[in-house]
A protein has these predicted regions:
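N-terminal export and membrane-targeting signals
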Residues: 1-11
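C-terminal motif of bacterial Sec signal peptides marking the signal peptidase cleavage site
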Residues: 13-16
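N-terminal "mature-domain start" segment
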Residues: 18-74
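Second-shell loop/turn segments in exported
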Residues: 32-33, 90-97, 157-162
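Soluble non-cytosolic domains of exported or imported proteins
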Residues: 37-41, 100-101, 162-166
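Short Gly/Thr-rich strand-loop-strand
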Residues: 60, 103-145
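A short acidic-to-branched-hydrophobic micro-motif
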Residues: 79-101
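Extracellularly exposed regions in secreted/surface proteins, prominently low-complexity, repeat-rich
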Residues: 131-180
């Protein structure tokens, strides 16, 4: 009886010491990667929940050097637009692995451009910066964007219809959930 109790207690204690973070076979933490395709149902649904009728909008990107889009593609990432194309309402989500310290280089640029550090509520990100809420460009179009680093993947969410962090969180979470 004592032996059985000792084994049971040991198993309970060992189970309590385990982690839910996946590990690779070599004992290192498993690396998450950006999605390979833009047709991420969870992301499409997150946009549709805020802008009824949203869908993935195939886009023929022509990235210019020095832009976030260019850097995403250089890092082997993808950029995807979701929304209602004819109404010109929607947003773009970009994913890229943090290769060659990409995040630190980009973060320096973003801070110099006026983005500010933020801690996203309910998200366990490594780092995040946001384009100030309610920013407008020269033509008065509303602009809102957030950049975050999570599990060594850079995610950028930008949209014309978002006004604040709370509105963006479901889309941000869907972008995180699409990592594999």
């Amino acid at each position: 009886m004592r032996k059985t109790l000792a084994v049971a207690v040991s198993l309970i204690l060992l189970t309590g010491c385990s982690t839910s973070t996946p590990e690779a076979s070599d004992g290192k933490m498993a690396q998450l990667t950006p999605p390979a395709s833009c047709e991420q149902e969870i992301v499409i649904q997150a946009f549709a929940d805020q802008v009824n009728g949203s869908r993935y909008v195939p886009t023929d990107w022509q990235p210019s050097p020095g832009t976030d889009l260019f850097d995403v593609y250089e890092a082997g990432g993808i950029a995807c637009t979701y929304g209602i194309q004819v109404a010109e309402i929607g947003g773009t989500v970009m994913w890229a692995s943090n290769v060659d310290n990409l995040w630190d280089r980009k973060k320096t640029e973003w801070l110099e451009q006026g983005q500010v550090q933020i801690d996203l509520p309910g998200i366990n990100e490594t780092d995040a910066v946001i384009l100030k809420e309610g920013s407008t460009s020269a033509d008065e179009m509303h602009v809102w964007a957030i950049n975050l680093l999570i599990n060594d993947v850079w995610i950028q969410v930008g949209a014309t219809f978002l006004q604040n962090v709370d509105e963006a969180l479901p889309i941000v979470q869907s972008a995180i959930d699409s990592l594999s």
